[in-house]
């Protein structure tokens, strides 16, 4: 009996991660040069912008929002379309040390959300009568590491010391 109680207490202290919900927070599409753009030869250039934000809801629940913005120009300066999606998720995250929590919110959760955002963007673009938008996978771990290095270099967060 005591062993079960001890195991139960130990289980409560184990790191926990659970996806609670994935949802579309915001979606927009603009094609400012329609219908003229459809009569032009298609020579696209793509600009992609990624952003994440997170906030603690209540207790151990966190909302992570991944914003993916795409601007496609035809030729040098004609904007074909602008599309943006805010894909969000609610995650239960417990018993992580601060470094692991930061990495989970900044890289792991966006990795989960990105395929949903990519699908929503592709659907928008096709419905706008443009060729499918095939976004490559994103390495959020590398982006997270770059952001941490940038913050350490600028003094926004201290550089960890080696003991």
Swiss-Prot record:
<dbReference type="InterPro" id="IPR003708">
    <property type="entry name" value="SecB"/>
</dbReference>
<dbReference type="InterPro" id="IPR035958">
    <property type="entry name" value="SecB-like_sf"/>
</dbReference>
<keyword id="KW-0143">Chaperone</keyword>
<dbReference type="GO" id="GO:0005737">
    <property type="term" value="C:cytoplasm"/>
</dbReference>
<comment type="similarity">
    <text>Belongs to the SecB family.</text>
</comment>
<protein>
    <recommendedName>
        <fullName>Protein-export protein SecB</fullName>
    </recommendedName>
</protein>
<keyword id="KW-0963">Cytoplasm</keyword>
<keyword id="KW-0813">Transport</keyword>
<dbReference type="GO" id="GO:0015031">
    <property type="term" value="P:protein transport"/>
</dbReference>
<dbReference type="GO" id="GO:0006457">
    <property type="term" value="P:protein folding"/>
</dbReference>
<dbReference type="GO" id="GO:0051262">
    <property type="term" value="P:protein tetramerization"/>
</dbReference>
<comment type="function">
    <text>One of the proteins required for the normal export of preproteins out of the cell cytoplasm. It is a molecular chaperone that binds to a subset of precursor proteins, maintaining them in a translocation-competent state. It also specifically binds to its receptor SecA.</text>
</comment>
<dbReference type="Pfam" id="PF02556">
    <property type="entry name" value="SecB"/>
</dbReference>
<comment type="subunit">
    <text>Homotetramer, a dimer of dimers. One homotetramer interacts with 1 SecA dimer.</text>
</comment>
<keyword id="KW-0811">Translocation</keyword>
<dbReference type="GO" id="GO:0051082">
    <property type="term" value="F:unfolded protein binding"/>
</dbReference>
<keyword id="KW-0653">Protein transport</keyword>
